[in-house]
Amino acid sequence: MRFGAWYPLSAAGDLSPEGEGVLQLRLATGLVDYPHGKSAMVWYQHARELRTAARALAVRFADKDLVCRHLIDVDAAVDLAAFCAKLREDFERRFGRVPELEP
C-alpha cells in the first residue's frame, strides 16, 4: 500500500475513489510549526465512503490552499481505520501534537 500523487483538495471529489479509504491533506505551500519540527501535513482521515468525505473536506477547507492524496494499491486484508490511527499516532509522536487542522 502506498499513497498516490497529490492533487488540489478542490478536485478531491472527482479524483478520490469511492468506497473505504484513507486520505491525507497538506499545505500546498509552506510548513506548520509543530512543537518538535515542521511539516506541511495537516489532516489524516479514514472514511467508509472516501469520495463523500473528500467532498466534505473540500467544502470545509475551501478557504485554505490544501492538496490531498489517498491510498492506492490497498491491501484488502489491512484494517484501514487502524492504519490511519497509526499514521496519526506516529505523527503526534514525531511532531509533538496532532496535525494542525484536526480537532
Language model: regions and residue ranges:
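GIY-YIG nuclease catalytic motif and its immediate N-terminal context
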Residues: 1-57, 74-93, 101-103
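A short hydrophobic beta-strand segment most commonly corresponding to one strand
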Residues: 66-74
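Conserved micro-motifs of the catalytic ATP-binding
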Residues: 96
